[in-house]
Every structure is written in C-alpha cells, then in structure tokens.
Amino acid sequence: MALSTGILHAAIEAARKSTYRVKLGAVVFKGKRILSTGWNQIRSSSLKHKNYENSLHAEQSALLGLEWKKLKGCSMLVVKISRAEERLGNACPCEMCRKLMDYIGIKNVFYTNEEGEIVKLKEN
C-alpha cells in the first residue's frame, strides 16, 4: 500500500519515542495531513500509596486529545520498529484498538506486517 513517506516517517519517529522494548507508533491522518501521532507508553498512577502501571497503546495515544466526532473518515497507520531500528515488524492493531477505531469512525487502518510491508486492515 502506497502512503505518503511523510506519514510513514512520522509513525517511525513516534515509535522511537517509546521506552518499551517493543516500539510502536501511530499516525492519524486525513489525505496527506497528519492530525496526531502517538506511541506505546506506560501510564502510572498512585492509588492509596500503591503505584499501578498501565500500558497505553500507540493507537490510543494518537487519539488522545482529539475531537472524536471530527475523525470520521480519517485514517490511521500503525508501525512497529525493531530494537535496532533496522526493520519494521508486525503492528496489527489488537481487538480493543480495532473496536475503538471502528467506534470513532476511522475509515482506513494500515499497519506494518511481519515483512515490513504496509497493509490495510481487512474489515470484518
């Protein structure tokens, strides 16, 4: 699938911001216009003096702070980079993120597969 190199570059740069061993980045875009980027990260909170860590998926991170009703018809690209950043890997969105994107109205979801190719997520 041919996407703008700017969109792919933005997704890779977002993935590089992750502190996880497995680095994922996501870009919400409409046409060639990038609306938001996100990466997988740890969100921690303190509750009764106990620390709890929760992971925030790259797709969720990219959607934070955006007006969801304005995203209908937008697209998303999700990429995974290796630790050495030498190649792209499988970044197929999980079921929870797919349901969230469907609920919001994200029209097209693209991701990198095991071969590092950009593919479109098949609709159910």
Model-predicted regions and their roles:
Residues 36-124:
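Zn2+-dependent cytidine deaminase-like catalytic core
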Residues 20, 24, 71-72:
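Secondary-structure boundary/capping residues
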Residues 23-32, 36, 110-111:
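Short beta-strand scaffold segments in enzyme catalytic cores
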Residues 1-22:
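Short, basic/aromatic recognition patches
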